């Protein structure tokens, strides 16, 4: 019986031999800064709009800042990144897609809501293990733009219970590499 379970697990498990987590970068909004992990973030926003006209533009700038920060921390040049895998909570991964316009790396947009980061890490690891040298995995959201799409637009003025869920304003990214 034990060998059947082991055989079954081997068929459903992906093993990575040549993938290493090299560096990470975490960007957070003002509300997250006030939390227990506030001093652990690499970069925090002073205001929700990040000096932009709209929350969506602020979210795009959050992605750009996090990706630039990751490259600086890892001492990698943009040309050394083979692919960026990631997404956000907006339709068509609009914030991530616009942030990637300036990048020389290939971009694979992912939309898996709260699972986007895990999905990007799994796909990134598979690509680095077999084909590529460096992959950036990224996911993020902005409370105000996600609220507009998923719950109640802030402009509607709906009162919130203190126990209501609160979407994070933040971006997390990691560099996966063969080295």
Tell what function each PLM region has.
Residues 111-138, 176:
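Active-site-proximal alpha-helical scaffold in enzymes
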Residues 148-177:
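Active-site glycine-rich loop that binds ribose-phosphate moieties when present
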Residues 87-92, 114, 139-145:
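Acidic, glycine-rich active-site loops and adjacent beta-strand->loop/helix elements
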Residues 53, 61-62, 115-125, 152:
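Generic detector of solvent-exposed, compositionally biased contiguous segments
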Residues 32, 144-147:
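A short beta-to-alpha transition loop/helix N-cap that caps and shapes the active-site region
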Residues 9-12, 124-127, 159-165:
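A generic local secondary-structure boundary/capping motif
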Residues 94-99, 119-121, 146-151:
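Short, conserved acidic/polar surface loops in the N-terminal third of protein domains
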Residues 1-108, 166-168, 172-179:
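Conserved "HGTGT" condensation-loop signature of ketosynthase/thiolase-family condensing enzymes
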């Amino acid at each position: 019986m034990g060998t059947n379970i082991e055989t079954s697990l081997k068929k459903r498990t992906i093993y990575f031999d040549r993938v290493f987590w090299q560096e990470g970068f975490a960007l957070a909004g003002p509300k997250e800064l006030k939390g227990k992990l506030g001093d652990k973030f690499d970069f925090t926003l002073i205001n929700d709009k990040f000096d932009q006209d709209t929350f969506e533009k602020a979210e795009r700038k959050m992605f750009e800042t996090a990706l630039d920060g990751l490259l600086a921390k890892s001492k990698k040049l943009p040309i050394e990144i083979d692919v960026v895998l990631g997404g956000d909570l907006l339709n068509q991964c609009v914030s991530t897609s616009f942030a990637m316009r300036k990048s020389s790396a290939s971009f694979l947009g992912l939309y898996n809501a709260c699972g986007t980061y895990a999905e990007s890490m799994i796909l990134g690891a598979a690509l680095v293990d077999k084909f590529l040298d460096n992959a950036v995995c990224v996911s993020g959201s902005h409370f105000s733009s996600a609220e507009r799409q998923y719950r109640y637009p802030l402009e509607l003025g709906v009162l919130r219970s203190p126990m209501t869920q609160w979407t994070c304003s933040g971006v997390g990214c990691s560099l996966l590499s063969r080295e």
